[in-house]
Amino acid sequence: FLDESGGACYCGKAGCVETVISGPALEKYYHKISGQPLNLKEITERYRDGNDKYAQQTMERLFAYFGKAISVVINIIDPDAIVIGGGVGNIAEIYTKGVEEVKKHVFNHRLDTQFFKPDLGDSAGVFGAAFL
């Protein structure tokens, strides 16, 4: 588990990826530290502007925990590719800064796993379920 301060997950546990680095979790974290509710797109824009310390803190937290979470997957199953879905997959920096954080935690000194945005955007899971 990543960080139990994210609160209870819908699965009944705490510290799950969903409660720490999903879009809603990032929005909740930003609101908690800043007192201001913003959506993920607004947080990302403020991060890029560089003038909002809470957006900076929120995004740096995302990259750090993303690196830890994804490195566990890579260290265990060594996938050729990972598709980053959901709102977080729309953040361009996840494919640069986030991947740099992954590199810090993988067993191998080089990272061969490729990272992709889903071709179907945020609806990839819905389309996949429909095909079942």
What are the residue ranges of the model-derived segments?
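Short glycine-rich, Thr/Ser-proximal phosphate-binding strand/loop in the N-terminal lobe
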Residues: 1
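ATP-binding/phosphotransfer module of carbohydrate and carboxylate kinases, centering on a glycine-rich
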Residues: 4-132
